[in-house]
Amino acid sequence: MQERGLVGLGLRREMLSEFCQQLPSAIDFLEVAPENWMTLGGKYGKQFRQLTEQHTFFCHGLSLSIGSPEPLDLEFVRRIKAFMDLHQIDVYSEHLSYCSGAGHLYDLMPIPFTEAAVKHVARRVKQVEDILERPLILENVSFYAAPSAQMTELAFLTAVLEEADCKLLLDVNNIYVNSINHQYDALAFLKAMPTERIAYLHIAGHFKESEELLIDTHGSDINAPVWALLDSCYAEHGVLPTLLERDFNLPATAHLLDEINQIHAYQARAKSNLDKRIA
């Protein structure tokens, strides 16, 4: 019998006390933005250390700014490495975007979809990996405009993965959000992703501003079309580790576990279907 698929949850400070008592068995790993935890001390710091000593953690960064025209903040990367070494965390992902340029921009901005940007990002990926002594996994991001685009989002993303020879954190919700906002076929985009490059998945909720505009919020339950896209993702690319993101409007843990268990159910069905095809 095959082991079940892995499902994780983004850790928030509000969860620390409860999870230090007992982490629900449905949660296989936790993910944190290192920027929010690197300088944490006191009670929260002790609770966090307790959890990292007992459970599997991934890091998902916010401030690397891999696509910025400004030089990489190498001291920041070294602090990330020290944090990951301290807590024995192996997985580090970041957004394929930038958040600095003539100062910090306080948002994740899309990188121009150009050949020059592909090569620029690839060089910086290797710089980061050399310091971290770990792979850098890049995430497809939601975006609302594509300035100076010379290629499609799909062409840009796959070109970066190939040029940098790196893995992909595939955000299923971002595919759906972008497909509505930029009017493309979400399923076709999903199927075009290189299976061998996908490291793990993100799934989250979004806000419907209008029929033509969705906002990637991570502040609500997962929507039905995103569940359907996740189901298609497992069928197309296999059952991959999947993380539920919920950044605000945090419900009770029991409610989050309902979604986590639903992810497990989709994974189990996909595994069963694969086993039937093999048999």
From Swiss-Prot:
It comes from the Bacteria. Disulfide bonds: none annotated. It holds the Pfam family MbnB_TglH_ChrH. InterPro entries: MbnB/TglH/ChrH (IPR007801), Xyl_isomerase-like_sf (IPR036237). Gene3D superfamilies: Divalent-metal-dependent TIM barrel enzymes. SUPFAM superfamilies: Xylose isomerase-like (SSF51658). HAMAP family: UPF0276 (MF_00697). Belongs to the UPF0276 family. This is UPF0276 protein SO_2008. It comes from Shewanella oneidensis (strain ATCC 700550 / JCM 31522 / CIP 106686 / LMG 19005 / NCIMB 14063 / MR-1).
